[in-house]
């Protein structure tokens, strides 16, 4: 919405995708540049084997899941079901999950309710400070479908299960 409001008053508009050009209302001064990807994402992708070894993954599949820095209730609920299933069925995975700021207590309650716990196969944190490294190591990512997350997933070529947010402007996920 902010971009749409400011577009008429700026010299140049940068758009992430071609579909945004007309919506921004200033096609004559809009350039499609795609979404930026942090250089660290590309750099760490080259260190995949070393990062996996550091994590102690061995031959296990690494699943990385997160719902954003604040946390997404539905992502935490779905991931809790998956973690319970993984542990019940002794699946050979290393699951790394970030609950987000408002998901810590919820996830702890879900652990008790569903009968699973962090340990050798499950690492739960509030926030991920080393996302480029974990994206490099992961085999599968479960997350919201934010534009920058999608750009980073594409940059490192990771398979993903994307959970759209119901709370975005103009249904952009």
Where are these regions (language model features)?
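Donor-nucleotide binding loops and adjacent catalytic segments primarily
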Residues: 47, 53, 57-140
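Short hydrophobic beta-strand element within catalytic cores of glycosyltransferases
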Residues: 143, 159-170
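Short acidic active-site motifs
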Residues: 1-2, 129-133, 149
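Active-site-proximal region of nucleotide-activated glycan assembly enzymes
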Residues: 1-46
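Conserved donor-binding/catalytic loop of nucleotide-activated donor transferases
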Residues: 136-138, 154-161
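Short glycine-/small-residue-rich Rossmann-like dinucleotide-binding loops
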Residues: 18, 68, 100, 146, ...
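Hydrophobic residues at beta-strand termini and immediately following loops
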Residues: 32-33, 125, 163
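Short, charged/polar "capping" segments at the starts of alpha-helices
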Residues: 20-23, 41-42, 102-108, 170
